[in-house]
């Protein structure tokens, strides 16, 4: 089985691509990408791992599954492609950032600037059918992303996990909290953001934890143009 990764994640996860569950997932995806409209594009599926190598991971933001609208998803949780309207949950994330740092509201939702600094923007499920939320649940991605979380437990310096909502917090059961830090809040969706996501101060708290551990903090502001990210 060909390993689709090309940085330090490649060696760490290479055994996963030989396992039965992944071979079944791969067969399922080949059929889906042939017969249906699937997001993100096949070459973008592993962008979270490609943009944020293992050795650079400082913060993890767990999402559920990719956006299922046209041209939104590009392999990073909560992020959208340049030129795409900022979705409601991401808009609420930006509102929280403006509250915490007094920054102006970003004009785009392309989060590669965060990913390149060490923020792993990982979804629980990495693909979805257009217009059908959660349509690729239970096909094997959850096993793969569990392995990503378990692999992060090996890191020497503390990683800060931002877990928003019940699904992400369930994944948190895999995290070694003797070494790493979990910050929990409701999901930033308009349905739940007012129940404690707003004013959670997760972004500034994450930076405080990094600073305390002599790790460079994240610049949560976004460049004016996505191409500068």
From Swiss-Prot:
Q: What is its EC number?
A: 3.2.2.27
Supply the source organism for this entry: Oceanobacillus iheyensis (strain DSM 14371 / CIP 107618 / JCM 11309 / KCTC 3954 / HTE831)
Q: Which UniProt keywords apply?
A: Cytoplasm, DNA damage, DNA repair, Hydrolase
GN (gene name): ung
Localization in the cell: Cytoplasm
What is the protein named? Answer: Uracil-DNA glycosylase
The record's NCBIfam families line, in alphabetical order, gives: PRK05254.1-1, PRK05254.1-2, PRK05254.1-4, PRK05254.1-5, ung
Q: Which SUPFAM superfamilies match?
A: Uracil-DNA glycosylase-like
Family annotation (InterPro entries): UDG_fam1 (IPR002043), Ura-DNA_Glyclase_AS (IPR018085), Uracil-DNA_glycosylase-like (IPR005122), Uracil-DNA_glycosylase-like_sf (IPR036895)
Residues the record marks as active site: 65
Q: Which family does it belong to?
A: Belongs to the uracil-DNA glycosylase (UDG) superfamily. UNG family.
What the entry lists under Gene3D superfamilies is as follows: Uracil-DNA glycosylase-like domain
Any one GO cellular component localisation term in the record: cytoplasm
Q: Which GO terms describe its molecular function?
A: uracil DNA N-glycosylase activity
């Amino acid at each position: 089985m060909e390993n689709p990764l090309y940085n330090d994640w490649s060696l760490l996860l290479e055994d996963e691509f030989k396992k039965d569950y992944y071979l079944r997932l791969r067969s399922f995806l080949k059929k889906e990408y042939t017969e249906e409209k699937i997001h993100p594009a096949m070459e973008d599926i592993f962008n979270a791992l490609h943009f944020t190598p293992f050795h650079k991971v400082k913060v993890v933001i767990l999402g559920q599954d990719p956006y299922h609208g046209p041209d939104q998803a590009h392999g990073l949780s909560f992020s959208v492609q340049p030129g795409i309207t900022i979705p409601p949950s991401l808009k609420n994330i930006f509102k929280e950032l403006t509250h915490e740092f007094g920054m102006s509201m970003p004009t785009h939702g392309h989060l590669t600037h965060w990913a390149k600094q060490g923020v792993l923007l990982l979804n629980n499920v990495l693909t979805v059918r257009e217009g059908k939320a959660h349509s690729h649940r239970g096909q094997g991605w959850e096993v793969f992303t569990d392995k990503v979380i378990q692999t992060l437990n090996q890191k020497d310096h503390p990683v800060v996990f931002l877990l928003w909502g019940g699904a992400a917090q369930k994944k948190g059961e895999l995290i070694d909290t003797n070494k790493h830090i979990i910050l929990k809040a409701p999901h930033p969706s308009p349905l739940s953001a007012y129940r404690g996501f707003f004013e959670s101060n997760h972004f500034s708290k994450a930076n405080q934890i990094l600073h305390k551990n002599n790790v460079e903090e994240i610049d949560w502001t976004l460049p004016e143009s996505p191409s500068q990210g």
